[in-house]
A protein has these predicted regions:
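Canonical Radical SAM [4Fe-4S] cluster-binding loop centered on the CxxxCxxC motif
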Residues: 86-122
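Flexible loop/turn segments at secondary-structure boundaries
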Residues: 2-4, 41-43, 83, 101-105, ...
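Beta-sheet entry/capping signal
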Residues: 32, 91-93, 103, 137-141, ...
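N-terminal [4Fe-4S]-dependent radical SAM core
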Residues: 42-93
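Structured alpha-helical segments in the cores of large, soluble enzyme domains
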Residues: 3, 92-100, 124-132, 157-160
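Secondary-structure transition/capping motifs at alpha-helix termini
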Residues: 13-16, 114-122, 130-138, 159-171
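Glycine-rich beta-alpha loop elements in corrinoid/cobalamin-binding modules
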Residues: 1-56
Length: 176
């Protein structure tokens, strides 16, 4: 993931005493990293962007999008820091997919987070179990841009019911 590459670069920059400008120029060479100060933006009269051009040789002409293709391989912590006080969202959160198929014109996230990628039922179930066992939470918020569009929703819920039966499992959707 790009965060690790940026962190590694930052550690190298600190170790070698780089100035901020050198760090930013090096970071811009990592795929998926956009450094605004390394680009000149020109605008049309109506305020829309006319062009974006690099102002130094280290900045690529076009910044490539980076995505995590296989969500099953994304790091997910098995143990969380849990507060000692009651908080508003006193539950753990589990992401089941990224992206959205609907393509609503008003939704920026639906376009930015493409393509749609899903975790497998087994990975979701294992992560949910581990979260409950290691945090003491008895609620999990299953999240995504559109959870009801998860293609394996029914098998996922059936699998989770195997171990949540005495505790119950609820799913609320705005269309219900």
């Amino acid at each position: 993931e790009v965060n690790l590459e940026i962190t590694d670069l930052y550690m190298q920059a600190k170790k070698e005493g780089w100035d901020k400008q050198r760090f930013l120029q090096q970071a811009a060479q990592i795929g998926g990293v956009y450094v605004p100060s390394l680009y000149d933006v020109s605008y049309r009269e109506d305020g829309t962007i006319d062009s974006v051009k690099p102002n130094c040789p280290q900045a690529p002409e076009k910044v490539t999008k980076r995505i995590i293709a296989d969500l099953d391989k994304v790091y997910y912590p098995k143990q969380f820091v849990v507060p000692f006080i009651n908080i508003v969202h006193d539950r753990s959160m589990l992401e089941i997919q990224r992206g959205c198929l609907r393509g609503c014109r008003f939704c920026q996230a639906g376009f930015i987070c493409r393509p749609v990628r899903e975790k497998s039922v087994d990975v979701i179930n294992a992560q949910a179990k581990a979260t409950c066992e290691n945090t003491g939470y008895d609620e999990i918020s299953i999240s995504s841009l559109s959870t009801s569009d998860y293609t394996k929703l029914e098998p996922m819920l059936e699998k989770m019911l195997e171990w949540t039966e005495p505790k119950h499992l609820s799913l609320i959707h705005i269309s219900e």
